[in-house]
């Protein structure tokens, strides 16, 4: 029986050179490649399919776009997911991709699982958190052979594998419907100004339209459901919002990120929809619909949720526990937020919710609904301990 290995395949340089390496260096008879569509460009999927058909023994392309948005992106929106300001598009996609690879591997009777991640990044951990739940061997050629990008380019050319990157522009790009990351090459130098050519989703703010774009975003139970009154599926909504926000220059991040291993890395991201959808949900509707105690506690929950998601630990029991609280807290986060997008800036213009705890009548300076004299007793004891402390210190 042929000795099979299942490879998580993106069509990029790293995973493409893994195919001959797994045969030549690791002795596998067949390499089954699995590409998972989580919103990459259609041409990228086609390019990966065409390449895999030529150099692998069997290839799968699995459409997981709607599943990705429904089961991974929407929970992130409800959790206000963010790691050091990063919207975690790559982070939340990896566990889903890994699970689809495992499913295909079992179908094929593979004895091993492989990925093309390096030993310096986070993705090796995210993939293997899922892979190592199986009894199959786990192989990481990039890490185990300590490969460099230049070596891979030469090796690919020797084996007739088409190479999109070059030694002078070795950008590594990872893309799904939620975000696009660009790293590597000269971008690793924090003092290097990224060339405009690395950006594809977002217009330079200087070249964005002169007229602002105003949109109404409808939310139900914490997730977006409509754009300017039009109901949309999750994937269609995020895709459309990427287009609108991106053409108005919204959604670029250039940051120094703390990786799981402790290394600091320079990362460039594009995430137009993520920038827009997290803001309206996290501020206007939540702040008007949840109590102060809920909001305070939810910040703690959101931070812990984000860390687990960034680490790829979505099968950790605590992750499910946190989601239970988040889902319950978001039941009342329903309403419409009006947003203005203009030359890279996002501004919340207005919000309305049937569940708002805000009362214009109660808070108005002109309202007599609340007798202001009633707060006098509260004011007398507000800061009481600080006053007592001051008296004690003044006596010393």
From Swiss-Prot:
One Gene Ontology molecular-function label: ATP binding
Sequence positions that bind L-aspartate: 118, 122-123
Pfam families associated with the record: Arginosuc_syn_C (PF20979), Arginosuc_synth (PF00764)
Location within or outside the cell: Cytoplasm
Keywords: Amino-acid biosynthesis, Arginine biosynthesis, ATP-binding, Cytoplasm, Ligase, Nucleotide-binding
Alphabetized InterPro entries for the sequence: Arginosuc_syn_C, Arginosuc_syn_N, Arginosuc_synth, Arginosuc_synth_CS, Arginosuc_synth_type_1_subfam, AS_cat/multimer_dom_body, Rossmann-like_a/b/a_fold
Subunit-level organization: Homotetramer.
Record-given protein name: Argininosuccinate synthase
Organism: Methanosarcina barkeri
């Amino acid at each position: 029986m042929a000795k099979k290995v299942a490879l998580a395949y993106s069509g990029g340089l790293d995973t493409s050179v893994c195919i001959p390496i797994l045969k030549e260096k690791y002795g596998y008879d067949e390499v089954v490649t699995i590409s998972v569509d989580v919103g990459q460009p259609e041409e990228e999927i086609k390019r990966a399919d065409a390449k895999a058909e030529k150099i692998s023994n069997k290839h799968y392309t699995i459409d997981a776009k709607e599943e990705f948005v429904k089961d991974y992106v929407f929970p992130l929106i409800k959790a206000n997911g963010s790691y050091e300001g990063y919207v975690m598009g790559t982070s939340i996609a990896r566990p889903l991709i890994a699970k689809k690879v495992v499913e295909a591997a079992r179908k094929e009777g593979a004895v091993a699982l492989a990925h093309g991640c390096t030993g310096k990044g986070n993705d090796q951990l995210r993939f293997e958190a899922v892979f190592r739940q199986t009894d199959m061997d786990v192989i990481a050629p990039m890490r185990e052979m300590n490969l460099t990008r230049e070596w891979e380019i030469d090796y690919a050319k020797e084996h007739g594998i088409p190479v999109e990157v070059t030694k002078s522009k070795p950008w590594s790009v990872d893309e799904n419907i939620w975000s696009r990351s660009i790293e590597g090459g000269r971008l690793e130098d924090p003092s290097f100004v990224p060339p405009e050519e690395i950006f594809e989703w977002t217009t330079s703010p200087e070249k964005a339209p002169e007229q602002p774009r105003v949109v109404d975003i409808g939310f139900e139970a914490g997730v977006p459901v409509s754009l300017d009154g039009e109901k949309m599926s999750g994937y269609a909504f995020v895709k459309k919002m990427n287009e609108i926000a991106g053409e108005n220059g919204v959604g670029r991040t250039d940051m120094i990120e703390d990786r799981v291993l402790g290394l600091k890395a320079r990362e460039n991201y594009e995430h137009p929809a993520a920038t827009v959808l997290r803001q309206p949900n996290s501020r206007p509707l939540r702040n008007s619909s949840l109590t102060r105690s809920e909001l305070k506690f939810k910040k703690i929950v959101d931070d812990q949720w984000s860390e687990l998601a960034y680490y790829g630990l979505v099968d950790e029991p605590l992750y499910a526990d946190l989601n239970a609280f988040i889902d319950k807290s978001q039941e009342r986060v329903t309403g419409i937020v009006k947003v203005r997008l203009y030359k890279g800036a996002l501004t919340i213009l207005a919000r309305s919710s049937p569940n708002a705890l805000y009362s214009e009548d109660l808070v108005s300076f002109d309202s007599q609904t609340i007798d202001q004299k009633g707060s006098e007793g509260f004011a007398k004891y507000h800061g009481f301990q600080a006053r007592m402390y001051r008296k004690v210190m003044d006596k010393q």
